[in-house]
Amino acid sequence: LVRKLARDGGLDLRQVSGSGPEGLILRADVELALATARDHRASAPAPVPVPSVAPAGERVPLRGVRGAVADKLSRSRTEIPDATCWVDADATELMAARAAMNAAGGPKISLLALLARICVHALARFPELNSTVDTAAREIVRLPDVHLGFAAQTPRGLVVPVVKDAGRRTAESLTEEFGRLTEAARQSALTPADLTGGTFTLNNYGVFGVDGSTPIINHPEAAMLGVGRIIPKPWVHQGELAVRQVVQLSLTFDHRVCDGGTAGGFLRYVADCVEQPAVLLRTV
């Protein structure tokens, strides 16, 4: 009876002092211990609820363009095991080639268009980077055409319009399409077709005065090339120290589609074309 009484009251008999012969715990001892415990609980102050404290400051909803960007970049970071490599390149000859093209008359050629041409040629040599990963099928899908995304700043945030069939376009056509899409982005007039279907992205963050960055891949693509600002720097040219126009190039790639040797080969080829564009661009 004593044990049942203690068990029903949630009392540990090891904590009770017995008043019976040789310390035997009696019913009265259990009843006294239970009454003492009830009195203690009744006299204990009620816990004071602590109000939840929200972080101070302005709260901006993640929706619209900002929300879409957040979702896509979060997915990229979650799903893609990426890595980034960098190289500095002497862009003096590329800048001179562009100046010569524009001095010859006709529509002006943008630097972004020349960089796009270089990317297209590099992807032809390293097709692993113009691909996507089908996670459900556990397959790498190498894509036959280059649809080139590029970062464009708008009043509502950064968007990535896509130049379709970039590999079939001349530098003049690329310049025109970059201009059209950039203006449409500024006017918030991009269509869903303008923003989808990319296979590789070119991010010219140098327009923001930035030297280098580690781009986040535009899911579900496999790579992104970042281009920093082109600025005068000391450079060893033909064995002599000279001031040259130098740019930092960075490539973030999905390590599932290729190893570092392939990614490094792609980036080195891009840098070589930036430094010696004459042969590559002769058909422009």
Region spans (language model):
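C-terminal catalytic/motor cores of large multi-domain enzyme assemblies
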Residues: 5-12, 21-24, 28-29, 37-284
